[in-house]
């Protein structure tokens, strides 16, 4: 093991991460679009525990989710070779920031050949990920035209997400990307919990399909983009295998002893 090289990569990576955070703070909303605070990224990684397998972020920004996932693996005596990383980013400049962020740390990743819209030009159409970590743009409006994506296979079994807000488009995209044992952790604005119409029907179907493992409300003022409250969603396609009955009550859990 080349410990000197490892230390140098870590120092350079931390410096890069520091300046990303400073830039996001200075730029405000524009900067926050590519940067998720480290504490939030760390929380998602600790909750879904991406020890080994394929990791995906459909709106990867500057690549912070991937960096923290690799740190999580290495902190549990694993190796970055234990995970395969896939991502996509729409903005060309942010796409370059992500590639640089990962290259500095020696992390191999497939971010697609070019920056592209996840909904209209999926760079990983056949991917089934074991872990998804994401912080989609909050309440993205007019993300598709009224007559666009109506028969998209990603919505199969659900209502078509409304045109006025992309929150449930992101959710269904991520569900479609999960492997049969996949787990997803992602951040959404609190309003995603109470939307009516198609959003309500999609939410109800997710519960009927037993996908929702947890939803946690996070403190305000954690993001540079907004001061609204946000929630962390955990979806788990393997939840049924970790179900027990205790005193007549069904409880769901994930084995955290590994």
What is the predicted role of each segment?
Residues 1, 210-211, 218, 228:
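Core catalytic lobe of class I
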Residues 1-51, 110-123, 217-220, 242-258:
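Non-catalytic, mostly N-terminal accessory regions of nucleic-acid modification and defense proteins
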Residues 40, 167-170, 229:
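Catalytic-loop motifs flanking and including active-site residues across diverse enzymes
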Residues 153-178:
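Glycine-rich S-adenosyl-L-methionine
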Residues 194-195, 222-226:
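Short glycine/serine/proline-enriched coil/turn segments at secondary-structure junctions
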Residues 228-232, 257:
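Short hydrophobic/aromatic beta-strand or adjacent loop that forms the aromatic wall/cage
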């Amino acid at each position: 093991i080349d410990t000197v090289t490892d230390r140098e990569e870590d120092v350079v990576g931390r410096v890069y991460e520091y300046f990303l955070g400073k830039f996001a703070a200075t730029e405000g909303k524009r900067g926050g679009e590519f940067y998720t605070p480290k504490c939030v990224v760390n929380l998602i990684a600790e909750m879904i525990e991406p020890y080994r397998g394929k990791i995906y972020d459909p709106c990867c920004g500057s690549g912070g989710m991937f960096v923290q996932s690799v740190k999580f693996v290495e902190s549990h005596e694993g190796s970055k070779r234990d995970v395969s990383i896939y991502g996509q980013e729409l903005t060309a400049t942010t796409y370059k920031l992500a590639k640089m962020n990962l290259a500095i740390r020696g992390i191999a990743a497939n971010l697609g050949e070019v920056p592209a819209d996840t909904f209209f030009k999926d760079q990983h159409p056949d991917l089934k990920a074991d872990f998804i970590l994401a912080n989609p743009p909050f309440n993205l409006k007019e993300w598709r035209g009224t007559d666009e994506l109506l028969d998209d296979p990603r919505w199969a079994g659900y209502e078509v997400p409304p045109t006025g807000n992309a929150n449930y488009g992101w959710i269904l995209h991520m569900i479609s990307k999960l492997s049969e044992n996949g787990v997803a952790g992602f951040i959404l604005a609190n309003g995603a919990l109470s939307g009516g119409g198609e959003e309500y029907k999609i939410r109800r179907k997710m519960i009927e399909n037993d996908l929702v493992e947890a939803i946690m409300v996070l403190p305000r003022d954690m993001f540079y983009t907004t001061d609204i409250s946000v929630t962390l969603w955990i979806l788990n396609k393997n939840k049924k295998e970790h179900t027990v009955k205790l005193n007549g009550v069904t409880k769901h859990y994930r084995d955290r002893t590994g």
